[in-house]
Structure formats: C-alpha cells, structure tokens
Amino acid sequence: MKNTTTSIDHQQMQRIKWLTYMMFMMFAMTTDAVGVIIPEIITAFDLSLTAASAFHYVPMIAIALSGLLLGYLADKLGRKTTIILGLVVFSVTSFLFAVGNSFWFFLSLMVCSGCAIGFFKTGALALIGDISSSGNEHTTTMNTVEGFFGVGAIIGPAIVSYLLASGFAWKYLYVIAGILCASLCLLAWKTNYPAMKKEQSEDITLKRTLKMMKNRYALGFSSAIALYVITEVAIYVWMPTLLRDYQGDMIWLATYALTIFFVFRALGRFLGAWVLSKFNWMQVMFATSLAIFCCYLFSMIYGIDAAVYLLPLSGLFMSMIYPTLNSKGISCFKKSEHGAVAGVILFFTAVAAALGPLAMGAVSDLFGDVKYGFYLATGFAGILFLMMAYNLLQKPTQ
C-alpha cells in the first residue's frame, strides 16, 4: 500500500507553504545572528573566544540530537502536532531571554531553542513531502524554503545591529522572534494539514530512525550535505577574520563581504527553482560544486586579494546545493519515513555546522594563521566536488 495524503484545497496549500517559508525565515533570524551576538557576550561576560563560541556550537549540537532522536515523532504524531509543539517551545524559550542576565542562563536557553528547532524543522521538512506531488516539485519548494531561510539570515544580524545602535540589548532579537513564532503557532493551529496514510504494519520508533543511519542513500546524501555545510559555515564564521587584514583597493568589499555572501545565497535559492527546471539536478550539483571548489582553491593560491572577490561570490554557487541534496535525500523514501530521514539529515547538518568551524579554528591555531583553516575547508570542498562528479557519472540513485 502506497503512502498518500488526503487532498486539501489550493488556498490551504498556499497557506501551508507560506507558514513553512516563515518558519524557516524566523529561525534563521536567530541562528545566523550568532556571529554578531558573540562579540557582545564576550564584552558583557568577559569570555574567552572558546567559551563564547559555545553560543554557536551548543545549539547546533542540540539541533542535531533533537533531529536524530525526535525526528521520528513527525511520522508518529503527525506533522501538525510536531510543528506546533516545536513552535511553542521555541516561542517560550525566546521570551525568556528578556528576563535573563547570565551567560549560563542564556546558554541553557540556546540548548532549549536548538531542541525546539530540531523538532519543528523535521516536521516542516516532512510536510514539504506531503504537499509535493513530484520529486521536481519537492526540490522547487525546498529551494524556495531555503531562500526564505537566506532572507532570515540577512534580517537577523541587521536587527541585532539596529538594536545595539539604538541602545537596546541583543537579547531582544529573541523577543521579536518569539512574537513572530507565537503568531506562526496560532496560524499553524488554525490551518488544515494534509493527513498522511501509512501502512498498518509500520512500526514508527526511534529504532527505525537509528537503523536508517545505515541506509546507503540516507548516509550518502547526509555525508554530501555535511561536506557542503562545512564549506558554507567556513564562510560566515571565519571569512571576516580572513579578510580582516585586507589592505587593497576594495576595502568596502571586504567590509560587506559577509552580507554580499548572504545576499548571493538567498538570491540563488530563489533562482534555483528556475535553474532546476531547465537542467538535470545532477548536472547542476556537479557544476556548482566545481565552482565552489574553484572559488576556494584560487582564493588559497592567489591569497587574500582574490579571496575578497571569490569567497563572497561562492554564495551564489552554494545556494542550490543544500536544498537540492536535502530534497533528493528525503524524497528517496516513503512519505511515512520523511520525518525520520529528515532527522538523520538534520543530525549530519548540525554536527557539521558545529564541528567544522571548530576544526578550522584548531588547525588555524596550530599553524598560526586562519588561512590554514581555509586550506582544510578547501579540501572538504574538493571532496564534495568528487562526490558530485561520482553522482553525475554513476547515477547511484537511479
């Protein structure tokens, strides 16, 4: 018996899509603003760089564990229940930032918000499969969803900068996110979601999710996504440090390099739907991964004068890789397994986002310059390209 979903009208379908878009934008506002927040907490709590970096890797680890250990609940409890529970926890956690004044209190809230994100994100990713009638539509929707994530990544740091310039604390970003999240929760509660039918014999448990870690398709896509995430996070965590000593004629470009990277990434994801309608997704992944590798390689060969141009430009080529691989990885499985496989992929995503920058930092400290961390990232970009070349030539999913 095949998995199906009950039909809902076009208006409800559009409402579900926009709710999903806004959810991804909302949590990107907080997760991708951490780079602007860390200097503030270093000053406020007299922290070392290692201690302050916990604001980045601790919630990422929480997202990873939540996705892996709780992702199957999106299949067991249903998408709507999972999404609403996650949004409620995230909203309450966000409001609690307003009453806190200690580093450990804030870090505890980051753990809670990470768990909530992992919970409702797996539900939202599984929901995309429910509302998609084909693999191409799934990939198109996923690119649009990640486009809104890219918009949130631009809005979040801008809000923090505005709050600080206006004399307000960074923590009120979370209050703003909490208000938006509470509104989304109410709208999600009032929205009719497609009801999924599954085989009566299916046993939806954590054991099934852990077993999926051995599936070659889940493992293959997750590994490729992890490699991509390491190369992407390298940009928004360490590129400002790499370009800090730039003394050329394009000082303004070095100053706004990270913003330009985020803009390219967001625009590319919105364009992804059109590009993927014209070309085979495996060809697109091969070409974009090659372009990313070249951006890294030539930045390392020709130094900071080339990196100031090439690393921000890489955002355009990175834009389509994550949503496309995520979509193809999830849609390989039955709809009743989408929550579990989304949790597995999210686990690899968040672990890579947490450990990648740490590995780069360790290598940079060992050799005394941040460029050595980028040599490591270049290696990961090269491996990603080789995987996409193998995918194009051997077509293992067909």
Enumerate the language-model features and the residues they cover.
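Extracytoplasmic
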Residues: 15-49, 121, 125, 235-240, ...
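Extracytoplasmic gate region of multi-pass secondary transporters
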Residues: 34-35, 216-259, 266
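Interfacial helix-cap and linker-helix signal at transmembrane-aqueous boundaries
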Residues: 41-42, 73-74, 159-168, 243-244, ...
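Central cavity-lining transmembrane alpha-helices of secondary-active solute carriers
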Residues: 57-71, 259-271
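Conserved MFS/SLC helix-loop-helix module at the cytosolic interface between two early adjacent transmembrane helices
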Residues: 65-104
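Cytoplasmic helix-loop-helix junction between adjacent transmembrane helices
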Residues: 109-148
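Helix-loop-helix hairpin linking two adjacent transmembrane segments in secondary transporters
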Residues: 144-192
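A late C-terminal transmembrane helix in Major Facilitator Superfamily
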Residues: 332-369
